[in-house]
């Protein structure tokens, strides 16, 4: 290889090895490195969903908690698991770097899994058994037992906070957007990334859930713990092949500086003279594998932060690029807010949807019964099929009409997912109304622990539709927040996606408790321990209306959203999307 060829072989996006040396694309990165990351994600998702998918069943049958309390405990924990990535993104972007942050978080994650497995195994800290189907008559778990169990759960949540935002960004960092070939490969990365996630989830929702229901919780939690150990080992084996990006400073501090500086100069007269605004020379950015961002007309009040007036203190004067990066993170907030409602719908899968399944006939054959939580596997299976069809069929067809390499824009893809969510809750409401009719027809409304003469597969449509919705909304959401985030804030951008799920779960807890209390005071409660006495159909119909209102707000947000564009080879895709939204 000639000197010129060696020079061209080095990445142009500022990626380095762990020692900080420039890296060659023929040795590190691309799909060779991503293969370790993707396989890690398969096993890690198997571990995580091996716990979360059946957690509602464990809390109702082993901790002897009621429907509302169990649902809220699950959604509060899941919400925390999705919220801690904000802290993980901060540490990865500003302090330790993504790789080191990820490895330390893996150790915390694994310790939580180990203690959780012990909490369902050792007699002294394992909750007492109960033979009755009425949880109100069962002996409650002791304070010590609850402390160990929930302590392990939330330790696990802290660990995932450092892994979730950094692992997907590490994977995306393996592709240099300045190289046309790697730029093209990166366009499909998020689709296959989600494919790996839901493949691991499918195994958890089927095999692991069956083991937990039919063999025991010790093995049922021990296998996910082993899976996590395997996933961490696989990731570490790929270390010689990874590209890394150096920490670029706290994105939160950078955004705070811009906001503070703009308020300090609130009375300063504005100008359109570009020389009046502070910016570093282009060479400063090139040395870091970055580039300056030109001023944009939106959120003009923030431009004062880079106005050359007053002192040059960093909390009084920012660069134009820092201002534009802050603008972009703020511009994405309305889109983030729109995703909260569909995230609430996802929270129903492993709580109320599963609770419905416990009341139905679960027999598939004479001797085999499907665990209620395994219905979540149909969400996964539906999504896997939908992603492949989307990537291989839908994109190719729509690309011919739109000229967009993605087929349609990311926001258009989100919009289709939002329409699916309206349909899902209508279908769920109709199905629940039919389930209540079957209970009434057979005189089983006031019976607990008795299975209705209705197959559990009556719930299948709402699970399948949820998977189809995810193939549009969840994939687009992850890619949108990564793609639209500035280069120095990619992990923070990715954490927007996890924040959406966190807030959605917390909102689900709040709404479930509120609706349950209000409806009980006004007569027949909508959500009771005995679902046959509840009106879950009304609750789902309320969700359908909520999704419809949310979709209308989404249309307003899309109308005013301006896509981010940067001076890189990857701008081609964004230019097409900007033209389509004009």
Curated annotation (Swiss-Prot):
GO terms for cellular component: membrane. It is found in: Membrane. One of its GO terms (biological process) is defense response to bacterium. Induction: By wounding, salicylic acid, abscisic acid, methyl jasmonate, salt treatment and amino acids histidine, leucine and phenylalanine. No induction by glutamic acid, methionine or tryptophan. It holds the Pfam family PTR2. Belongs to the major facilitator superfamily. Proton-dependent oligopeptide transporter (POT/PTR) (TC 2.A.17) family. Keywords: Membrane, Transmembrane, Transmembrane helix. The keyword Signal does not apply. The chain crosses the membrane at residues 77-97, 100-120, 141-161, 189-209, 217-237, 334-354, 370-390, 408-428, 452-472, 493-515, 538-558. InterPro entries: MFS_trans_sf, NRT1/PTR, POT_fam. CDD domains: MFS_NPF5. This is Protein NRT1/ PTR FAMILY 5.2. Its main location: membrane. The keyword Transmembrane applies. It is a multi-pass membrane protein. Expressed in roots. Detected in shoots, leaves and flowers. GO terms for molecular function: dipeptide transmembrane transporter activity; tripeptide transmembrane transporter activity. Peptide transporter involved in stress tolerance in seeds during germination and in defense against virulent bacterial pathogens.
């Amino acid at each position: 290889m000639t000197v010129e060829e060696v020079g061209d072989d080095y990445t142009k996006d500022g990626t380095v090895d762990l020692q900080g040396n420039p890296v060659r694309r023929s040795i590190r990165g691309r799909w060779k490195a991503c293969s370790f990351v993707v396989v890690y994600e398969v096993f890690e998702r198997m571990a995580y969903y091996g716990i979360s998918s059946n957690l509602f069943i464990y809390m109702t049958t082993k901790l002897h908690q009621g429907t509302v309390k169990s649902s809220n405990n699950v959604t509060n924990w899941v919400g925390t698991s999705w919220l801690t990535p904000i802290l993980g993104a901060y540490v990865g972007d500003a302090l330790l770097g993504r790789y080191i942050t990820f490895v330390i978080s893996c150790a915390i994650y694994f310790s939580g899994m180990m203690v959780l497995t012990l909490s369902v195994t050792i007699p002294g800290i394992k909750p007492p058994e109960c033979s009755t189907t009425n949880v109100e008559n069962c002996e409650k778990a002791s304070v010590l037992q609850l402390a160990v169990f929930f302590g392990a759960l939330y330790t696990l949540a802290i660990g995932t906070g450092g892994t979730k935002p950094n692992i997907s960004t590490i994977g995306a960092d393996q592709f240099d957007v300045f190289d046309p070939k790697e730029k093209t490969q990166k366009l499909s990365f998020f689709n296959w990334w989600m494919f790996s996630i839901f493949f691991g989830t499918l195994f958890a929702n089927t095999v692991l859930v069956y083991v937990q229901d039919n063999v025991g919780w010790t093995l049922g939690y021990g296998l996910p713990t082993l899976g996590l150990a395997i996933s961490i080992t696989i990731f570490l084996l790929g270390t010689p092949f990874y590209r890394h990006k150096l920490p670029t400073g706290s994105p939160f501090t950078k955004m705070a500086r811009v906001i503070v500086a703009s308020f300090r100069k609130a009375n300063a007269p504005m100008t359109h003279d570009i020389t009046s605004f502070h910016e570093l020379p282009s060479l400063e950015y090139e040395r870091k594998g970055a580039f300056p961002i030109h001023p944009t007309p939106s959120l003009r009040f923030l431009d004062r932060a880079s106005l050359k007036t007053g002192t040059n203190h960093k909390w009084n004067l920012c660069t134009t690029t820092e201002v534009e990066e802050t603008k972009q993170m703020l511009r994405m907030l309305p889109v983030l807010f729109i995703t909260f409602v569909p995230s609430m719908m996802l929270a129903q899968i492993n709580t109320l949807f599963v609770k419905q399944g416990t009341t139905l006939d679960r027999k598939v054959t004479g001797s085999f019964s499907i665990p209620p939580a395994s219905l979540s596997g149909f969400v996964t299976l539906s999504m896997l099929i939908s992603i492949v069809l989307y990537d291989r069929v839908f994109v190719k067809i729509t690309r011919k009409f739109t000229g967009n390499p993605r087929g349609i824009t990311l926001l258009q893809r989100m919009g289709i997912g939002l329409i699916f969510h309206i349909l899902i809750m209508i279908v769920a409401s109709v199905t629940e109304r039919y389930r209540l009719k079957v209970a009434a027809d057979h005189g089983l409304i006031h019976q607990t622990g008795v299975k209705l003469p209705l197959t559990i597969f009556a719930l299948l449509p709402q699970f399948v539709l949820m998977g189809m919705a995810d193939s549009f909304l969840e994939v687009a959401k992850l890619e949108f927040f990564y793609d639209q985030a500035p280069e120095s804030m990619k992990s923070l951008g990715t954490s927007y996606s996890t924040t959406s799920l966190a807030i959605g779960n917390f909102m689900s807890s709040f709404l479930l408790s509120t609706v349950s209390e209000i409806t009980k005071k006004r007569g027949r409660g909508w959500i009771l321990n005995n679902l046959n006495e509840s009106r879950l159909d009304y609750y789902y119909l309320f969700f359908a209306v909520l999704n419809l209102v949310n979709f209308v707000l989404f249309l307003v947000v899309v109308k005013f959203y301006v896509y981010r564009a940067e001076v890189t080879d990857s701008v081609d895709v964004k230019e097409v999307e900007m033209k389509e939204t004009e």
